[in-house]
Amino acid sequence: MELLVVAVLGLLGIAAATAIGPKVGVAAPLLLVIVGIAVSFLPFVPDVVIDPEWILAGVLPPLLYSASVSMPSMEFRREFGAISGLSVVLVVVSSVALGFLFTWLVPGISLAAGIAFGAIVSPTDAVATSIVKRIGVTPRVVTVLEGESLLNDATALVLLRSAIAATAASVTFWQVVGDFVFAVVVAVMIGVLVGFANLWLRSRVTDATVNTVISVTVPFLAAVPSELLGASGLVAAVVAGLVTGQGAARRLSPQHRQSDAQNWRTIELILEGAVFLGRGLELSAILSALQAEESRGIAVGWRIAAVALVAVIVVRAIYVLPTL
């Protein structure tokens, strides 16, 4: 019963933040983080610790699939070069640059570990996209940022896994590159296969409700086999969504597409809101753990984080400005 009450309150909080955010000029994800932080410091609220596996396996595949399946086909094809550059090339370049920076700032850290940390902080998230939409930039910029957000998390996680593998074993640079390429290529193949199978099956189902139920399973049908084969489940989910979105107008009825769009918008709202609310709720537990550390170590950590933030902004500016 207690878990049910928490879930209901969380849903109400997500709905309220989404409705109030635009009125107060604050992006809904950022507002949810603030609410989560405030709640985490209430004396009767226990420490919240979320298993990362729940996010990686249960939340991110449908969240990224939802965003990719709703991506406008024409705009995505037109801006594919910019989107792929930002979501793949820029993430890799930023992660490697931060890897060298961390090896210089933190004594004893290896380059592979530095790149792993760089992969964690390089991608943009929903807050950035929400802020950009609100300040009224051109539709092209919004399309590019939304497209970038589809793949940059997946790219960063593949790079993170490869970097962690490099820290745990004696592997060569080309072995790491091979692992990265394998994870992406196999995931793309599975995503394409699942996407076309999804369109084929659902074009033969007449009931809109059954059609929607099938669609909810698609990101997991793409992600789970990919992970079992050592590839990226997130890349597979994104590709399956892109294939579905590109072919839906030709293969699915208007009723099915409308039902799909409404249900996936709801799922995306709930999952994205839960992620940011959870970030805020975890802060109290994180600070409690940090209190056991030396204050000097915490201060050094803040300085390193500030330098890393500046470095990410500089690298992104150097990459983006010539393309404007």
List where the protein language model places each region.
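Transmembrane helical cores of multi-pass secondary ion antiporters/exchangers
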Residues: M1-L324
